[in-house]
Amino acid sequence: METWFLYFITKSISYALFMVLIVTFLESLALVGLFLPGIVLMSILGTLIGNGTLSFYPAWIVGIIGCMCGDWISYYCGFKFKKCITNLHLLKNNNVVLDKITNTLTNYPITTILLGRFIGPTRPLVPMVCGMLNISLKTFIIPNILGCILWPPIYFLPGIFTGIAISNTTNYSENTYFKIQFLAAILLIWLGIFLLWKLWKRYTDTGKKKIYISNVNLCLLLTISLSAGITIMIYIQSNSTLIFFRKILWKILISSQ
């Protein structure tokens, strides 16, 4: 699938923008998004931005439109066809996920609508469940729009860096020490974010679960991983390779029209 997708989008910029619209729309569409490898497809599109084939801002705007269309249609479907949706075989097999989304939406609607967009399994479900719960448009629309604005560039980012790296291999291929530091910083920061999410889930999940690590130790690991990752990231800011990457990234953002 990814090979065919890459072949299609490299044929024309118009095709690429059309695929940004389709991918972001289907990723956000109720239930359909569960079956798409969103991070893979968005990273491929981000690679085209990184190597200069596709402009950043048009792709971002098209991505926002696709996200909003998918979310708002999902919200309408949840509101209009609640009874039909609850009888779907797919949802009956995923009652645990649906119940968790329902509980968090009931207690933390704005936070769940915003953060739910960035979590793969919940992205195509949260707007639909909002409609099913009759959550008001006033509550739904602001965090939804904010999530739709932030989601495309965040998911483009891995591909953008990959595109820059592929197009400029001679500028960093020998700097192995920098690559190890950079990778370690990214992994530690992502670990910290993951632990923060796990800690948040513990405080919001009312069900009883086996706890293999105490909250104190979890907070300690969270603090250490984030502190170490941020410290390494600050330390390598003066590295010539990172300076080069920043210049290329800035050029992509400034020159895009």
Swiss-Prot record:
Q: Which residues cross the membrane?
A: 5-25, 29-49, 53-73, 146-166, 180-200, 216-236
Q: How does the record say this protein sits in the membrane?
A: Multi-pass membrane protein
Q: Pfam family example for this protein?
A: VTT_dom
Which superkingdom heads the taxonomic lineage of this protein's source?
Bacteria
Q: Where in the cell is it found?
A: Cell membrane
InterPro entries documented for this protein: DedA-like (IPR032818), VTT_dom (IPR032816)
What GO CC terms are in its UniProt record? plasma membrane
Among its keywords, does the record have Transmembrane helix? yes
Alphabetical keyword list = Cell membrane, Membrane, Transmembrane, Transmembrane helix
Its family? Belongs to the DedA family.
The record, for PANTHER family, names:
INNER MEMBRANE PROTEIN DEDA-RELATED (PTHR30353), INNER MEMBRANE PROTEIN YABI (PTHR30353:SF15)
Under which name does UniProt file this protein?
A: Uncharacterized membrane protein bbp_130
